[in-house]
Amino acid sequence: MAITALPSADGQELTIQIQGRFDFGAHQDFRDAYERVAITPRRYVVDLRNATYLDSSALGMLLLLRDHAGGENAQISLANCSPEVRKILAISNFEQLFKIS
């Protein structure tokens, strides 16, 4: 599992890339990815292209990111979701909270 935070050149967007299992073991690294950056982004992208697994802990971490980013006003996209990940997000009604692609 690896988590990488990539701020955009203008500092307006933060992309968080997830590689491998996105589960409880990723909690601290995921939190650090958005709390310990030198910018205050307006938009967040969680790139799940290389995520091989996602569990209920990951769903909770996404909700914590949403709270950190402003709750209902947060601009967060969950990008490059596999069909399996999309199914988990749909069952959890996350399409009402996040932009999913």
UniProtKB/Swiss-Prot annotation:
GO terms for cellular component: extracellular region. It is found in: Secreted. Residues 14-101 form the STAS domain. Its main location: secreted. InterPro entries: STAS_dom (IPR002645), STAS_dom_sf (IPR036513). The keyword Secreted applies. Phosphorylated on a serine residue, possibly on Ser-56. Keywords: Secreted. The keyword Cell cycle does not apply. One of its GO terms (molecular function) is anti-sigma factor antagonist activity. It comes from the Bacteria. PROSITE patterns: STAS. PANTHER family: ANTI-SIGMA FACTOR ANTAGONIST TM_1081-RELATED-RELATED, STAS DOMAIN-CONTAINING PROTEIN. This is STAS-domain containing protein PA14_20770. It comes from Pseudomonas aeruginosa (strain UCBPP-PA14).
